[in-house]
């Protein structure tokens, strides 16, 4: 990928630039906990975005998206947001840096990525983080890593129209090879936990169902509202920190639906803590067991799964896979699977054939390795 970028950069701009990269991410466990003030447990992966960048001595940004074969340029003082969706991310990062008092100038760039689109692995965060990190380095802006992540988040909010949380950008900026990060979404404190499945006889693989169910209404908002209603009854700002005993005590004051939603979230908080403790002991069996619990909690209590993802999790269990669950918001997308190496090939074959027989197409197999986040490449 780097070679292809360099060739195109030379063709377009007759010069050479510097290379920067960032990563997509997985979230091992901790789903729908972020907006409840809880914990998430992401890691950067070996699929991401690479950009070659060189200052051009003007006030204009000239950008080429190699994967799409599209070109865009915009002035750094222009108010008009570019029409191309991908260019909005670069424009937004530039604008958010300027809002924070960062002085930047025009540059040329060619970029490409290998984060599978639509798989819930945060290709957009990888793009934002690559450019935020690169501009911070190239212009010696001195912006700390947390603010780089917030620049990515603000770009989504203000220029793309996606009201995302901070997890994706955080993982993309702070990612560290061989480690997952437990992020406290209330305090924004985080801790690295060693995660080296390959050294313990395991692989991590995503199975993309390639299904995205169109939804009537606002299912994410509905679930968030459920959580907020229960938190209010409990006299808390967030569900974070609530116990099952407290929930049972107010069961007759809330709807059955709100009860089930809250039961999932409170359980998920504990599962994140359980997984962190288990990893400290090298206990991958407990990690896997909690992943299955999360899947069926998301399916039965939170009701954000779908038939295809339940099918993949069921096949995983039948094949002896250590852990499997929905990854992401739900209603389609991927399962994330923790598989013993000796079972890997048989599981992949079974999942592909069984899924194709039932749904008419194979899931896309995406093996991942936990890797570094935003960085400059040699």
Spans of features found by a protein language model:
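Gly/Ser-rich oxyanion-binding loop with an adjacent helix/lid
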Residues: 1-20, 26-39, 73-77, 83-196, ...
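Short Gly/aromatic-enriched secondary-structure transition segments
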Residues: 37-44, 223-224
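Short, amphipathic alpha-helical segments that act as regulatory/interfacial helices
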Residues: 45, 94, 228-231
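FabD-like malonyl-/acyl-CoA
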Residues: 125-126, 334-338
């Amino acid at each position: 990928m780097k070679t292809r970028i360099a060739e195109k950069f030379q063709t377009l701009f007759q010069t050479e630039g510097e290379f920067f990269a960032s990563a997509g991410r997985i979230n091992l466990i901790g789903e729908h906990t972020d907006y409840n003030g809880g914990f998430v447990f992401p890691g950067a992966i070996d699929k991401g975005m690479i950009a070659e960048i060189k200052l051009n001595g003007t006030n204009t940004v000239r950008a080429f998206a190699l994967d799409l074969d599209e070109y865009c340029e915009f002035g750094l003082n222009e108010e008009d947001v570019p029409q191309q969706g991908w260019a909005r991310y670069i424009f937004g990062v530039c604008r958010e840096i300027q809002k924070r008092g960062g002085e930047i100038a025009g540059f040329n760039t060619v970029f490409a990525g290998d984060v599978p689109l639509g798989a819930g692995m945060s290709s957009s965060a990888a793009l934002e983080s690559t450019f935020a990190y690169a501009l911070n380095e190239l212009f010696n802006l001195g912006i700390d890593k947390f603010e780089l992540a917030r620049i990515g988040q603000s770009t989504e909010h203000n220029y793309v129209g996606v009201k995302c949380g901070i997890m994706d950008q955080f993982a993309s900026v702070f990612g560290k090879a061989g480690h997952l990060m437990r992020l406290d979404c209330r305090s924004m404190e985080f801790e690295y936990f060693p995660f080296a499945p390959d050294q313990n006889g395991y692989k991590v693989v995503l199975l993309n169902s390639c299904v995205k169910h169109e939804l009537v209404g606002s299912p994410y908002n509905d679930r968030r509202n459920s959580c907020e209603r229960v938190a209010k009854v409990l006299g808390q700002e967030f569900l974070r920190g609530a116990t099952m005993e407290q929930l049972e005590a107010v069961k007759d004051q809330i709807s059955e639906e709100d009860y089930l939603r809250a039961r999932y979230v409170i359980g998920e908080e504990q599962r994140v803590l359980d997984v962190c403790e288990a990893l400290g002991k090298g206990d991958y069996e407990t990690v896997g067991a909690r992943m299955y619990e999360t899947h069926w909690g998301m399916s039965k209590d939170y009701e954000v799964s779908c038939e295809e993802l339940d099918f993949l999790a069921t096949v995983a269990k039948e094949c002896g896979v250590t852990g499997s669950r929905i990854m992401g918001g739900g209603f389609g997308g991927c399962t994330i699977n923790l598989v013993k190496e000796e079972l890997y090939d048989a599981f992949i074959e079974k999942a592909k054939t069984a899924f194709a027989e039932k749904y008419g197409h194979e899931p896309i197999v995406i093996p991942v390795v936990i890797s570094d986040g935003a960085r400059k490449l040699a």
